[in-house]
């Protein structure tokens, strides 16, 4: 399970700055899509090959009222469910009453907590450690989030408490590397062959996610139908999501449910308690995400936040618009227009209009799940990907840079789930985003991929002679001397004739 780290602290101690620094490598992917909100409180981050989730819990000062009090309540819930907490304090401002209140709360919860003293660029780190020692949370880890100082040491301490996972099944491979289990190889003129792997043995893992009260529990119960099995908690802490294995049409699946517990033999609908931690970890652990939205409410900001995280992780995606029944035709037309306008950045995902309560359209979700999973794990040979690249360049050439044409030479697969296509060429740093989008759409169309994002990475061509010196043999040196002597004599004769 991917660890979740919560950033905790009163307002203006630098949580957002640290969040942006930790997640910047992944934020760049989402930032390419206009219309996708940048104001997110959670993101995926990587450090030394390890993946983890960061949650910015927002500022807690202890005197919140109204909507701020509700936000503080959600922050405390995130703290409760996180694997570890980075408690941030401001070295310049010193110890405050709000710091003491938060510190007392963390001590009572017996959380894995690391005290982080930010803004030490103008304060002696030893003084900062002494200043915050009354909190009773150990020595403070000094950092300067704005400049990146102390971040590596902080992460070494925070992530060191978690066991290192085995190789990620979604890890990106190298050209010519061994085929991962469960993936397909497709060669020209051949039918794809399946290689049984762990994903097929336990079934496609499907995460049902969405805002509270959009019908996730109803959809899970409808998908399980009468073939439900005994519900059990995955080994771990009580905050873990529920993993429900089942079969349909001789295909194995595992539903990852974050909405609530059902009782065997009857449908038990409880008020859904939305958990950010459960949702984010379910996305990370899934092969395919079914994103449930309320058709009557349309697209709201929180939907975009969650979709942004799905896009970051590269998971295959199916969108389900629930509560479609009973809507007027004019309302349906408006919702479809809004989906096309606001969700264009995930236009690769199949959209289903369903009624989880009555079962309308639910059965069609499985076909999209299967297609998305297959698209996400298929592997293609270098020759095939290069041919598609050459055809795309022939049809629409990349732009000129400094009077020179960008050259894209060949492509190969760098990883699967999601497919990563590595393109080699010259001046690749100058390839515009619009042209990358053109290549993505071309690969998607030709390879007939659905439900999965495609990532393209460029690599510049290295000069094989750079840094090398041409060393002459003795024979070559003597020959060079004779030629130079001959040229000098010929030049002298030419000058003498002119006289």
Swiss-Prot record:
Which PROSITE patterns did the record assign? G_ENGA
Task: Could you list this entry's UniProt keywords, alphabetically sorted.
Answer: GTP-binding, Nucleotide-binding, Repeat, Ribosome biogenesis
Q: Identify the residues that bind GTP 2.
A: 210-217, 257-261, 322-325
Q: Where is the composition biased (Acidic residues)?
A: 168-186
Q: Report whether Magnesium shows up as a keyword of the record.
A: no
Give residue ranges for domain EngA-type G: 3-166, 204-377
Looking up HAMAP family in the UniProt record yields:
GTPase_Der
Its function, per the record, reads: GTPase that plays an essential role in the late steps of ribosome biogenesis.
User: Which protein family is it in?
Assistant: Belongs to the TRAFAC class TrmE-Era-EngA-EngB-Septin-like GTPase superfamily. EngA (Der) GTPase family.
What quaternary structure, including any partners, is listed in this protein's UniProt entry? Associates with the 50S ribosomal subunit.
Name of the featured protein: GTPase Der
Q: Which organism is it from?
A: Stutzerimonas stutzeri (strain A1501)
């Amino acid at each position: 399970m991917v660890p979740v780290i919560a950033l905790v602290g009163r307002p203006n101690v630098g949580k957002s700055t640290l969040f942006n620094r930790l997640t910047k490598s992944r934020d760049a992917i989402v930032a390419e899509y206009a219309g996708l909100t940048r104001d997110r409180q959670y993101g995926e981050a990587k450090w030394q090959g390890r993946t983890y989730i960061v949650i910015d819990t927002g500022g807690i000062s202890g005197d919140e009222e109204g909507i701020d009090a509700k936000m503080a309540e959600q922050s405390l819930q995130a703290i409760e469910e996180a694997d570890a907490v980075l408690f941030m304090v401001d070295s310049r401002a010193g110890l405050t009453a709000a710091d003491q209140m938060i510190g007392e709360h963390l001590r009572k919860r017996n959380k894995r907590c690391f005290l982080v003293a930010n803004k030490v660029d103008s304060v002696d780190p030893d003084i900062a450690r002494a200043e915050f020692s009354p909190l009773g949370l150990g020595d403070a880890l000094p950092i300067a989030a704005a400049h990146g100082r102390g971040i590596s040491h902080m992460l070494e301490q925070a992530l060191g408490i978690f066991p290192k996972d085995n190789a990620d099944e979604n890890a990106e491979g190298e050209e010519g590397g061994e085929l991962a289990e469960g993936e397909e190889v497709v060669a020209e003129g051949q039918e794809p062959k399946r290689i049984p792997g762990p994903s097929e043995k336990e079934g496609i893992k499907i995460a049902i996610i969405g805002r509270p009260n959009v019908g996730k529990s109803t959809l899970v119960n409808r998908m399980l139908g009468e073939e439900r099995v005994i519900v059990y908690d995955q080994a771990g802490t009580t905050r873990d999501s529920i993993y429900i294995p089942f079969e349909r049409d001789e295909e194995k699946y595992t539903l990852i449910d974050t909405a609530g517990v059902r009782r065997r033999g009857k449908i038990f609908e409880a008020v859904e308690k939305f958990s950010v931690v459960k949702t984010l970890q379910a996305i990370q652990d899934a092969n395919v995400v079914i994103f449930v939205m309320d058709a009557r409410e349309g697209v709201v900001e929180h939907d975009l936040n969650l979709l942004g995280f799905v896009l970051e992780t590269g998971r295959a995606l199916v969108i389900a618009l629930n509560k479609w029944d009973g809507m007027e035709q004019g309302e349906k037309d408006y919702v479809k227009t809004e989906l096309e306008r606001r969700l264009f950045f995930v236009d690769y995902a199949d959209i289903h209009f369903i009624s989880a309560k009555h079962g309308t359209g639910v059965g069609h979700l499985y076909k999209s799940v299967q297609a998305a999973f297959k698209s996400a794990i298929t592997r293609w040979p270098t020759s095939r990907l290069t041919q598609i690249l050459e055809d795309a360049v022939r049809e629409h050439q990349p732009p000129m840079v400094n009077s020179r044409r960008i050259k894209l030479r060949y492509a190969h697969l760098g990883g699967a789930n999601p497919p990563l296509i590595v393109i080699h060429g010259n001046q690749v740093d100058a390839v515009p985003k619009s042209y990358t989008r053109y290549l993505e759409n071309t690969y998607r169309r030709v390879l007939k991929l659905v439900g999965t994002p495609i990532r393209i990475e460029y690599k510049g061509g290295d000069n094989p002679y750079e840094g090398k010196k041409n060393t002459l043999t003795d024979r070559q040196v003597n020959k060079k001397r004779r030629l130079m002597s001959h040229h000098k004599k010929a030049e002298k004769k030419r000058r003498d004739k002119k006289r």
